[in-house]
Amino acid sequence: YRLTYYTPDNQVSETDILAAFRMTPQPGVPAEECGAAVAAESSTGTWTTVWTDGLTQLDRDKGRCYDLEPVPGESNQYIAYVAYPIDLFEEGSVTNLLTSIVGNVFGFKALRALRLEDLRIPPAYSKTFWGPPHGIQVERDRLNKYGRPLLGCTIKPKLGLSAKNYGRAVYECLRGGLDFTKDDENVNSQSFMRWRDRFLFCAEAIYKAQTETGEVKGHYLNATAGTCEEMYKRASFAAQIGVPIIMHDYLTGGFTANTSLAMYCRDNGLLLHIHRAMHAVIDRQRNHGIHFRVLAKTLRMSGGDHLHSGTVVGKLEGEREVTLGFVDLMRDAYVEKDRSRGIYFTQDWCGMGGTMPVASGGIHVWHMPALTEIFGDDACLQFGGGTLGHPWGNAPGAAANRVASEACVQARNEGRDLSREGGDVIREACKWSPEL
């Protein structure tokens, strides 16, 4: 492979799709051979020379390993940089992009382990994608909420509630001060709560809470289903009853289904919340799999207005600088290369709308100062047990979160250092809020 696919003197084109792989060769296999094999097996190569190679423009179409970089502190690990010509990929298809780059090469026996760390999506390719159905600014305009993080809550217990009791829990949280409530990722249409009943009771809760508070409210109605046709039916019903947002589990549902649903949401005025259920199966191993920053980039291309991104401070794993790196890749129009945050390539999204990060998992009011400092305003902070676990009930739990959030935002705007004074800010707010 290395005679054809390892090209250290290669000049990368501005239209090439670039990939950074963390590569662990098998003992005795040269790194150059492994890097070339990755480039070959994820583009035009196969295990032997075939006569039909002569019928193609192989030098133009092949992937090329153009650089190898030893991983500091590891004896047999390398970052292999691979450039793929843009013509290898179908326009507007995340499915085809991932099928080509990661679909086959991970089983290559010359490799002990392989992890896709990052992708550079050139403007020439990113412009073939619609991106998020609406984006952060349009969502803020629809909600008429600015200058603070949005607040949400996942309804618990996740399974077992009747539709009416579920709707009651939604109402209590929304009237208490939250902006959103959420279906858990595995709430679809089970025997104890069919989807249509849940949608109707949640819509009633939303409208009642909006009337009482004067604020726009929403509930992430999970439209994920066993078939795309059923998913469209649920999304269509949500649009008919006038709710603002629905939800999809994009990894278990699939990228093709997600892109189709995002297009439906764009055409029908629905925001789309994305849950990353199953992500840790793919991204948790440090030496093998796909890093979440790649899954976040591909989701932004496929389409999603919200995406769960980890918390840094809660119960789920996430390193602060690395998490902030892919949060920027979700929200910002242009992100510079920064290896300290795990960003291997400069990424220019060329005006594609941003996806709002959602921090969820084991967080509560004492985390509010850190979350406000880390994520800023353009984020949704989801407190499940941190709302429903309040000793006075759901509405007081929601009120406590809202008071804590607004106190932290005000303190930040006054120039106070939340990393040092966050505890004092919460204690001061407690004097004026018995719920907190």
From Swiss-Prot:
Its EC number is 4.1.1.39. The keyword Chloroplast applies. Mg(2+) binds at K182, D184, E185. Binds 1 Mg(2+) ion per subunit. The record marks K315 as: Transition state stabilizer. The lineage of its organism: Eukaryota, Discoba, Euglenozoa, Euglenida, Spirocuta. GO terms for cellular component: chloroplast. HAMAP family: RuBisCO_L_type1. Keywords: Calvin cycle, Carbon dioxide fixation, Chloroplast, Disulfide bond, Lyase, Magnesium, Metal-binding, Monooxygenase, Oxidoreductase, Photorespiration, Photosynthesis, Plastid. The basic functional RuBisCO is composed of a large chain homodimer in a 'head-to-tail' conformation. In form I RuBisCO this homodimer is arranged in a barrel-like tetramer with the small subunits forming a tetrameric 'cap' on each end of the 'barrel'. It comes from Euglena geniculata. The modification N6-carboxylysine is found at K182. This is Ribulose bisphosphate carboxylase large chain. GO terms for biological process: photorespiration; reductive pentose-phosphate cycle. The disulfide bond which can form in the large chain dimeric partners within the hexadecamer appears to be associated with oxidative stress and protein turnover. It is an enzyme of class 4 (lyase). PROSITE patterns: RUBISCO_LARGE. GO terms for molecular function: magnesium ion binding; monooxygenase activity; ribulose-bisphosphate carboxylase activity. Pfam families: RuBisCO_large (PF00016), RuBisCO_large_N (PF02788). Belongs to the RuBisCO large chain family. Type I subfamily.
